[in-house]
């Protein structure tokens, strides 16, 4: 017997990331090949015609799992009974825009969306914020949804995780699928800290295999941190397909489990690893039965502490920059 359809809300539905995302969701890549989905698509009033065009294409794919589509400019319609909410739309940084202006423009969007989720979404809704600054946007949405569990709100660090995996595979000559126990700590920004001290490939320590601290500090960490900028430089457009792929990975693993493998998610801190509570911070997790669980008890050396504190300082600055815009 067919499963009842799950409702997946996607914001920024007319944008480039959504264009790479929606067809894969409708194809079963997000929630499984036996799980029908209803897409609930949100974008601005001026983007509604473009969203309709995307939906025409979705129709033309005749996806067996696509049980329905809603198009709206009202967050309360888009998030109604949503099981998953992918918050992709955000205000991009325009030329000459100060970071604080970007923060307040996004605070406005994510307070409204957080409040709408609070009011109408499923109480078990899984929220992934993709739109930048993702960690702080997720924090704003979480703080604007006091009736939903904090653990429902996450930010995407999976793109950074996947970028780090690919760099490590290239350097070590090992298949990307063989690499386990990678962590990416902190903010989805160039301050993030990709950490392969615990990582293995085919059971061997990557630290021993690569054995090049200079490469780690001066090539690997900056390459992962600045990869988004390098793609804009090369392509003239920001990474969209790889971001959509990471969003699929993040939610699929959260829902269907990681079989004990570590992945990175931006989640509300519980105070461990010296991160203040509620800050949405990238940490290694495993997922099982629809829940994520942080990997605990990892040793933090002096270099790692310095890196983790630097990315935390940026997150605290962002949090303080939006504090006056939040009621709670």
UniProtKB/Swiss-Prot annotation:
The keyword Transmembrane helix does not apply. The keyword Ion transport does not apply. Substrate binds at residues 93, 99, 132, 163. It catalyses: (S)-malate + NAD(+) = oxaloacetate + NADH + H(+). InterPro entries: L-lactate/malate_DH, Lactate/malate_DH_C, Lactate/malate_DH_N, Lactate_DH/Glyco_Ohase_4_C, Malate_DH_type2, NAD(P)-bd_dom_sf. GO terms for molecular function: L-malate dehydrogenase (NAD+) activity. Catalyzes the reversible oxidation of malate to oxaloacetate. NCBIfam families: MalateDH-SF1, PRK05442.1. This is Malate dehydrogenase.
């Amino acid at each position: 017997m067919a499963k009842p359809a799950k409702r997946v809300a996607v914001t920024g539905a007319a944008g480039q990331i959504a264009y790479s995302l929606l067809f894969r969701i409708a194809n079963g890549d997000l929630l499984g090949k036996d799980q029908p989905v209803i897409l609930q698509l949100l974008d601005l009033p001026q983007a509604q015609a473009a969203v309709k065009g995307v939906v025409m294409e979705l129709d033309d794919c005749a996806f067996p799992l696509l049980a329905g589509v809603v198009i709206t400019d009202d967050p309360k319609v888009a998030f109604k009974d949503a099981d998953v909410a992918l918050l992709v739309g955000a205000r991009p940084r325009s030329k000459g825009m100060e970071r604080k202006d970007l923060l307040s423009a996004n605070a406005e969007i994510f307070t409204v969306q957080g409040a709408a989720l609070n009011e109408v979404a499923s109480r078990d809704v899984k929220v992934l914020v993709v739109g930048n600054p993702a960690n702080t946007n997720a924090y704003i949405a979480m703080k604007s949804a006091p009736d939903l569990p904090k653990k429902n709100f996450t930010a995407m660090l999976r793109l950074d995780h996947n970028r780090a995996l690919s760099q490590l595979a290239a350097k070590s000559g090992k298949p990307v699928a063989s690499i386990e126990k990678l962590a990416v700590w902190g903010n989805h920004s160039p301050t993030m800290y990709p950490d392969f001290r615990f990582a293995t490939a085919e059971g061997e320590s990557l630290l021993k295999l690569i054995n090049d601290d200079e490469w780690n500090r001066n090539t690997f960490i900056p390459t992962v941190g600045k990869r988004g900028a390098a793609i804009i430089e090369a392509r003239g457009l920001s990474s969209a397909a790889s971001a959509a792929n990471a969003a699929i990975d993040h939610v699929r693993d959260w829902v269907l489990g990681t079989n004990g493998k570590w992945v990175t998610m931006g989640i509300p801190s519980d105070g461990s690893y010296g991160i203040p509570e509620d800050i949405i911070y990238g940490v290694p997790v495993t997922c099982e039965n629809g829940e994520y669980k942080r990997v605990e008890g990892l040793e933090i050396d002096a270099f790692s502490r310095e890196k983790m504190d630097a990315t935390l300082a940026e997150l605290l600055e962002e949090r303080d920059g939006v504090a006056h815009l939040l009621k709670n």
